[in-house]
Design a protein with these regions (language model features):
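Transmembrane helices of ABC transporter permease
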Residues: 34, 38-51, 62, 163-217, ...
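Transmembrane helix-loop-helix hairpins at lipid-water interfaces of multipass membrane proteins
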Residues: 39-103, 184-188, 299-303
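ABC-type nucleotide-binding domain
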Residues: 352-353, 359-610
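Alpha-helical segments in transporter systems
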Residues: 37-62, 93, 108-112, 158-173, ...
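Helix-loop-helix
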Residues: 181-195, 265, 269-338, 343-344
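An intracellular "coupling" helix at the cytosolic face of ABC transporter transmembrane type-1 domains
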Residues: 33-37, 135-136, 154-161, 165, ...
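Short intracellular "coupling" helices and adjacent cytoplasmic loop segments at the cytosolic face
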Residues: 11-16, 116, 124-148, 152-154, ...
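Juxtamembrane loop-to-helix connectors within ABC transporter transmembrane domains
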Residues: 24, 32, 111, 131-176, ...
Length: 610
């Protein structure tokens, strides 16, 4: 089954690796420069929250020492425990933890705002970028690949950025702060606790090294699975019509098996990390407890210090694990950022030109002057194409499939630029116009109609957004669609669904004609009336098109030659070249390629009727 793209191609899963990790993060931090003050506040509150949290175990240790000394005193016949002192210590600890929680809440609130504003800005810039991209970019990239950058990659960036930034600050602060507190209790116990670090680092490196390739595989196959699901859904009618269900299921299962294999291995290695780290941490607790007991007997430390130290050891190993997780999240952040910035850095169309030609007052004369073009420079498909079209003329472009008919239209609207030669409107090269102003001169109505989810009124008004309701209705009347709209529930306020399947194919084409009439363009690009409608609707479409073409230069891409007999000029294309041009009668009289095409269509019709 041909690849048609998928929504999930490279969605930025944890562990996906960027090609240029440092460069991408540097670019991301530069991009977030507008939030520099916010990030400073995030860092300050994160550090404060962590410091207050770190002080807690040391103070709790004093409470433990007070309780221990009180018990010993009571056994020895003394005054026993000082509950007032113990209460003061516990209240102080509670206050510290409350302040710590408040600081963490504030930094989390600020960081969430920063990450959401960053993703909002990225989505906005990507959306604007899409409108400035050349058509050949979309012709060479799967739809899902582009959509993934707007959805999956930006979401991944926002989520991982929100988590990794604060996690990194708090983890590093915790490691430094806990190390200082441990040293203040006992340098010897600190040395024993730190000995577990090299083992942890080695194991983490081993796990991360072996999991990376499986994460990349998981990401690749996830994109393939999403792409297959998208094309199966969009083409399910064709699949059923050709009885290809088993082939589709077999292909999907093969890709799904690969995804399962790589996902299982990546998650297995990722899942190994926590149990291994916990085992090493427990070994550290045992060593610290034994050494702490010995030092207490020697009166080198207090009993409460053992309890404080064990808490610090736990707090020391936990941020190390978090740093490892942050490393994974940063990889994910960098990978998603890289893909987003790659798209934002893509070459754009030049939207404006110095001293542009104004479209005001232009009549619609068009000239193709020795045009050469190929989608690939090594394969030219339009060779030395020349033609002159006068304003108001109806020009039919005919030829077999692949002759270059649609390509000529794309060049005329400057979706692509010619390799050599020139296309001129009223003597001005199309390259001398701003693209947006140039395209304002054109209206397009093709057999493949495009209507969006919204009301019928909104769909017609898309031709000119500042049009009044009355102007929209007048355009609909000119397109012979007004009466049909009035029969619908809600009339012009009826909502079309996402595929506009709640109106017929012919009605769709009438609506797009109404849209073009409202736009009032100088030059029209038309497909012939769709052949998949009843005779009455086809007559209405033809009348609407006649109203639309009146007084306008019109290019009609024709397949049924019987529909363009009244054209002022017929351009006959073959393998990218104009091989004949003239009126219908002139071309038939020549008995050339056009006559062969015309006669073959009527021979096919006669055979079908017979």
């Amino acid at each position: 089954m041909p690849r048609m793209g998928g929504h999930g191609a490279h969605g930025g899963m944890p562990g996906e690796k960027a090609k240029d990790f440092k460069g991408t993060l540097k670019k991301l931090f530069k991009y977030m420069g507008a939030f520099k003050v916010h990030m400073i506040f995030v860092a300050v509150f994160a550090v404060c929250g962590t410091v207050f949290n770190i002080a807690g175990p040391k103070i709790l240790g004093k409470a433990t020492t007070e309780i221990f000394n009180g018990l010993v005193s009571k056994v020895s016949g003394g005054s026993g425990m000082d509950f007032g002192r113990i209460g003061q210590i516990l209240l102080m600890t509670l206050g510290l933890y409350l302040i710590s929680a408040l600081c963490s809440f504030i930094q989390g609130l600020i960081m969430t705002g920063v990450s959401q504003k960053t993703t909002y800005r990225l989505r906005k810039e990507i959306s604007e970028k899409i409108n400035r991209m050349p058509m050949n970019y979309f012709d060479t990239k799967p739809v899902g690949e582009i959509l993934s950058r707007v959805t999956n990659d930006v979401d991944t960036l926002g989520q991982s950025l929100n988590q990794s930034a604060t996690q990194l600050i708090t983890s590093v602060t915790t490691i430094i702060g806990v190390l200082v507190m441990m040293l203040s209790i006992s340098p010897l116990m600190t040395l024993v606790a730190i000995l577990i670090l090299p083992i942890s680092v080695l194991l983490l490196s081993f796990v991360m090294k072996h999991s990376q390739r499986y994460f990349r595989g998981q990401q690749e196959y996830l994109g393939n699975v999403n792409g297959q699901v998208e094309e199966i859904y969009s083409g399910h009618n064709i699949i059923k019509a050709f009885n290809k269900e088993e082939d589709v299921i077999r292909e999907f299962n093969a890709t799904n098996d690969k995804l399962y294999d790589s996902a299982w291995k990546s998650q297995f290695f990722s899942g190994m990390m926590m149990p291994v780290m916990q085992f090493i941490g427990n070994l550290g607790y045992v060593a610290v407890a034994i050494l702490g007991g010995y030092l207490t007997i020697k009166n080198a430390i207090e009993v409460g210090d053992i309890q404080s130290f064990i808490q610090y050891v736990r707090n020391f190993t936990q941020p190390i694990q978090q740093v490892a997780q942050v490393a994974n999240m940063l990889q994910s952040t960098a990978a998603a950022s890289e893909r987003v910035f790659e798209f934002l850095d893509e070459a754009e169309e030049d939207q404006t030109v110095p001293n542009p030609v104004s479209v005001e007052g232009l009549q619609g004369n068009v000239e193709f002057d020795h045009v050469h073009f190929g989608y690939n420079p090594d394969k030219i498909i339009i060779n030395d194409f020349s033609a002159k079209v006068k304003e108001g003329q109806k020009i039919a472009i005919v030829g077999p499939t692949g002759a270059g008919k649609t390509t000529m239209i794309k060049l005329l609207m400057r979706f692509y630029d010619v390799n050599s030669g020139a296309i001129k409107i009223d003597g001005h090269n199309v390259k001398d116009f701003n693209r947006s102003e140039l395209r304002q001169m054109f209206g397009m109505v093709l057999q493949d109609t495009w209507l969006f989810h919204g009301t019928i009124m909104e769909n017609i008004r898309y031709g000119r957004l500042d049009a009044t309701d009355e102007e929209v209705i007048q355009a609909a009347k000119a397109a012979h669609v007004h009466r049909f709209v009035q029969t619908l529930p809600g009339g012009y306020n009826m909502e079309l669904n996402e595929e506009a399947s709640n109106v017929s194919q012919g009605q769709k084409q009438l609506l797009t004609i109404a849209r073009a009439i409202l736009a009032d363009p100088k030059i029209l690009i038309l497909g012939e009336a769709t052949s998949s409608v009843d005779t009455r609707t086809e007559v209405l479409i033809q009348k609407a098109m006649d109203n639309l073409m009146r007084g306008r230069t019109s290019f009609v891409i024709a397949h049924r030659l019987s529909t363009i007999r009244d054209a002022d000029l017929i351009l006959v294309m073959r393998e990218g070249d104009i091989v004949e041009q003239g009126t219908h009668e002139e071309l038939l009289a020549k008995g050339g390629f056009y006559a062969d095409l015309y006669n073959s269509q009527f021979e096919s019709t006669d055979l079908t009727c017979a």
